[in-house]
Amino acid sequence: MEKSWFNFMFSKGELEYRGELSKAMDSFAPGEKTTISQDRFIYDMDKNFYGWDERSSYSSSYSNNVDLLVSSKDIRNFISDDTFFVRDSNKNSYSIFFDKKKKIFEIDNDFSDLEKFFYSYCSSSYLNNRSKGDNDLHYDPYIKDTKYNCTNHINSCIDSYFRSYICIDNNFLIDSNNFNESYIYNFICSESGKIRESKNYKIRTNRNRSNLISSKDFDITQNYNQLWIQCDNCYGLMYKKVKMNVCEQCGHYLKMSSSERIELLIDPGTWNPMDEDMVSADPIKFHSKEEPYKNRIDSAQKTTGLTDAVQTGTGQLNGIPVALGVMDFRFMGGSMGSVVGEKITRLIEYATNQCLPLILVCSSGGARMQEGSLSLMQMAKISSVLCDYQSSKKLFYISILTSPTTGGVTASFGMLGDIIIAEPYAYIAFAGKRVIEQTLKKAVPEGSQAAESLLRKGLLDAIVPRNLLKGVLSELFQLHAFFPLNTN
């Protein structure tokens, strides 16, 4: 394992870099040459720091210190499964271990086995050649094994490392001694108050092997989870209302609940829901060893606040009366059962009788297996009433496909729209990639089930970003002679 030694001085906005030793610890000797060239770092007597070919004046803020030291383009030059020996502004020392493959971040305060080496190294000619005057606050030839509470310093190290490793915007880093205010802390921690297991980041200290999360920290995060949402691609934070669940850092489209989509499309105060009290009665008495179907329904209802996986109703879109159905993937994967099929069927029949344009927003994993053939019947039932709506009444139906739209929904009303619109990067398929590969024993080309690929093959009419969707729908309706109500 490679050993490296740094001296970080964060007090009064000053930072000092003393070099990296690339050989094993047992091969260290006083006065060995460091592997970092002097051209890359300049340290003058006025405590001005320059580096990475940027010869501009160095700011005194903590965040700029970190930006200059661990920029995203240079982080891999000195972080590669290394142990860093760090001394803070209080002249207390500890080691920081990074393992990129196993995603481990480890801190050790025990220096009993290293004390002899550090004493020898700090007394070497390399350090003695530097100024030892009274004004040189950085000089300390002795490194002691102290019980220093390094929580705040751990926070800054986590901030600087992970922000550089995943290229987080500098503006999010807050110069604060409060661990709860750390941006990195908020996005590493999930809403359940545990370390995100999707990336398997393990943040611990050797002293207690416990994570750095308390119930108080979790409460602070929970207070604002209705305002901010975390990107599941780059783990950045964004403001819900402004960004429409689209990550401003990587452009990733996050899932939206049915209520959020209704709020996005329907004018405020005009939404009138339909059939809200319709619930599944477990028609085939589906038996499961893991969890009974009724229990799964109850759990999904408590989690989402919905009775089933679709919301239907009427409202106005830029003043134009419309019938709208929105599926919610949070409710058992948006699966289509008897309740979903019946609610959509009733919505289409109402739109037919009232001569309303129809919008169905699809987000589903397909037919609900817990209801057997009854769920498959919904495909034919919805398609039948759509045929009357489109062919007999000559009314206008727009299908909006979001990620994911698969299975029975794709094979029925999802692809029956007069205009079929998809969101960018939406996953749209009949059978999933894994099912196809296991059945046909062939690899599915990457991106072949994405909206962009389907558009090129003529299966979609348009791909419309969320921020433009309402305006595009309004223009399409007016093109087909559906105009806003006269408000005079």
Curated annotation (Swiss-Prot):
Organism per entry: Arabidopsis thaliana (Mouse-ear cress)
Location in the cell: Plastid, Chloroplast membrane; Plastid, Chloroplast stroma
The reaction(s) this protein catalyses: N(6)-carboxybiotinyl-L-lysyl-[protein] + acetyl-CoA = N(6)-biotinyl-L-lysyl-[protein] + malonyl-CoA
Subunit structure: Acetyl-CoA carboxylase is a heterohexamer composed of biotin carboxyl carrier protein, biotin carboxylase and 2 subunits each of ACCase subunit alpha and ACCase plastid-coded subunit beta (accD).
Database matches in Gene3D superfamilies: 2-enoyl-CoA Hydratase, Chain A, domain 1
EC number annotated for this UniProt entry: 2.1.3.15
Keyword vocabulary terms for this entry: ATP-binding, Chloroplast, Fatty acid biosynthesis, Fatty acid metabolism, Lipid biosynthesis, Lipid metabolism, Membrane, Metal-binding, Nucleotide-binding, Plastid, Transferase, Zinc, Zinc-finger
Major localisation: plastid
SUPFAM superfamilies xref list: ClpP/crotonase
Stored NCBIfam families: accD
Cofactor field: Zn(2+)
One GO BP: malonyl-CoA biosynthetic process
Segments forming C4-type zinc fingers: 231-250
UniProt keyword Ribosomal protein present: no
GO cellular component: acetyl-CoA carboxylase complex; chloroplast membrane; chloroplast stroma
Tissue specificity remark: Accumulates in fatty acids synthesizing tissues such as embryos, expanding leaves, flower buds, flowers, and developing siliques.
Cystine residue pairs: none
Annotated metabolic or biological route of this protein: Lipid metabolism; malonyl-CoA biosynthesis; malonyl-CoA from acetyl-CoA: step 1/1
Protein family membership: Belongs to the AccD/PCCB family.
Gene: accD
Protein name: Acetyl-coenzyme A carboxylase carboxyl transferase subunit beta, chloroplastic
GO MF annotation list: acetyl-CoA carboxylase activity; ATP binding; carboxyl- or carbamoyltransferase activity; zinc ion binding
